[in-house]
């Protein structure tokens, strides 16, 4: 890969992939509004233990979405001993009753579409296209060494650790940064770029969700490349080999002895398509290794990967190609 496209890809990721500060702040405001609504509207007998930021917003791997369709995960946990029925006050509330209680507390006359109960959460909609998913947890033996949590789901209460992925991811980033400066930051950028690639053709491609892509990126990321163009190429290369061996994805945040499968089978349609699209991408990028590869060929190859709508062409025009350099 003789011609570097590191600066252009970093600029593209910062401008067109990563969330802007303005969008992030707006999402946080909506999250805080929901939290305030819950505090004000929940029954007095019910005591909140914590609000729990989850998902890609919490670990800073969220990307810009067409139409502003952002999905924020923000859980709420309750002291289990306070989740008692309103009339008798003796029986434990069921998972359905807790989700209904949370849904009612989140309702607001200002909403054009009121919150709805889903399998494992309550969803709050916003006119800008955003939605906030609010899962509910009960905390048993709170503030003791035996503390554990259960998620309110459609099938009842289920053991769950809502901060497990957050902790695992932050530890992974910190470990990478200790080994090599900015390796953790590059890891985050690679996840966001992989998500952008997966969503670059919209509904034309059937792609796995962000959690599966994050777990695959963790398996396939190599920290030895300072350049983001090389790092992403080898992420795709390693991912292609990984999917050739197996298309099953595991939750790597869990202990190895008890990991849950995130896929349903070896041949989930979205995993099969991901493998094919990664293979296609590597074929497009083969030209980068040619001795006679030109700057325009490099630009066109990367534009095919991310479907940038002319961003790289504009970037090169503004910078007169000064970001390119020969690589040893």
Roles of regions detected by a PLM:
Residues 63, 130-192, 324, 328:
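Extended, alpha-helix-rich binding/interface surfaces that flank or overlap catalytic cores
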Residues 22-25, 38, 42, 59, ...:
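Conserved catalytic core of two-metal-ion nucleotidyltransferases
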Residues 1-13, 250-328:
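Terminal (often C-terminal) interaction modules
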Residues 73:
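Glycine- and aspartate-rich repeat motifs characteristic of hemolysin/RTX-like Ca2+-binding segments
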Residues 18, 189, 208, 212, ...:
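Soluble secreted/lumenal catalytic domains
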Residues 1-69, 78-95:
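N-terminal regions immediately upstream of nucleotidyltransferase
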Residues 182, 186-293:
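Conserved nucleotidyltransferase catalytic core and NTase-mimicking acidic/glycine-rich helix/loop elements
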